[in-house]
């Protein structure tokens, strides 16, 4: 066993090599304080024939890692939690660009949390553990990467804060990359205010992150290189194209290829290129269909990139900084609390808003928190197949859908003034040609306003792209699906006029320089201004229907009266909820009653509850201690009998009093009894 300790970027990491999981291609135990993560890499020796990178990253939390037993009926870890899925995506998006383009060997990277101290950053630790395990596996010429998190408290940036410091921060910036460049970025603003970060300050934070990554990656390479396995798979020369076929495509079919490039819809574009491939295959049998499709793809990609870099024009004829036409419609769904249809080019998001009560909040268990937490603001993103013209059924939410919903939530969360409000936004993507997550942000911000939710400001989102050839590059605003597929970067940025509230950057290159990222940030700001202007114009036309929106009424009663509102077996509260069609939250220790629903019904419910409690008090006032009554047995329970009293109300005759007098009662019997006490609104009886 080899044991390695690395000190960098405000933390001490320990790596135990060759101790466990020895049948994997590589494995290690990562330790940061009391946090221990098992990282393993397994590679199959037979490549797949499909044209994709067969990489799977799985991050798993174990409840025992925090000394817990899983909640719920089944005491075993089951379906992956959102945090596990989002962390898996975070690691995947960092590592995927590092692999050679023609790497086709199925590879599984597994991160299993065995022990965790909530003060440590699980995502940074997991990515660093995965990076080290992959570097040691040496399955291909892959650079070392690392991650860091940047917080901002006051005007000071902090590298790799612990959880306590992050909770005080106005910024949560997660960055990963090599010692030369950045691979992946996740950012969100934090706090009670909007806390949008200005572009120059964002650049300063990214520079600090780059410095930290350079230090850590340099140490990783120095320390881990002597422990690497032998290189398993060398990078090949890639696909060898038939020059005669390429010339044929450029000379005889170029106009048709351009027509396909200019087709805005994915399904339409695929049909055009399928027809071209079929036509060539029939006319030139010496070329295989696969060979033709590969060559078509190469000519298409080369021409798109040439148009953008040399001609400064895009496939849909837009200028590089131009945003597609925007149309915003509101109040489409009469029964929802809000609905906004946001259309940008051929991307369309319908965001529906619904307000709820505390009982509607989503409860999560995670190693990141000591106790289950309540998620009060939910953003759910759905990408049905029909939005891109695909004929397939709708299933459970995919990793991508969870990721896009989380990004939109992060963009909008700090814009909400009242963080205690329970809000669910759902984005239904009805049509997609790129930037659907950013369309969801724009529609979501307006949906919050239309729901009567108080917000600090509107938030808009735009997806930026980049095409790079040698020393030349071009930054694109509001990228389409084709530009996303053929470009080198997908940089989603959301914010208001002052700054950024959330961003996410992925790249297909081995990394991107800070100068290019800053150029993209400034260009995105101009695009955001344009979008926000249209959104503010749409906001002025929104009429909030307050009579339809749910209202919340909060009042207090004596804590011992809460049981009266609940009733035996919940009978009373069920009747109230069914009668008035409202939602009720009760707090037993404080006596707080929270009613939510239609304003008129809420007020009637409050009046009913107060009158009901008053009537119970009046019933008690009619009786005196030691008063003898003729009562009737209403119902028999394990601990005694409830008796209907002659002047209204009921009292409890306990079982021990019945046993003492050797009395056997049945429902409907009449019996003489005596009032012995009043306890928390209840009348206690004894046999007279």
From Swiss-Prot:
InterPro entries: ExoRNase_PH_dom1, ExoRNase_PH_dom2, ExoRNase_PH_dom2_sf, KH_dom, KH_dom_type_1, KH_dom_type_1_sf, NA-bd_OB-fold, PNPase. Keywords: Cytoplasm, Magnesium, Metal-binding, Nucleotidyltransferase, RNA-binding, Transferase. Its cofactor is Mg(2+). GO terms for cellular component: cytosol. NCBIfam families: polynuc_phos, PRK11824.1. Involved in mRNA degradation. Catalyzes the phosphorolysis of single-stranded polyribonucleotides processively in the 3'- to 5'-direction. This is Polyribonucleotide nucleotidyltransferase. It comes from Helicobacter pylori (strain HPAG1).
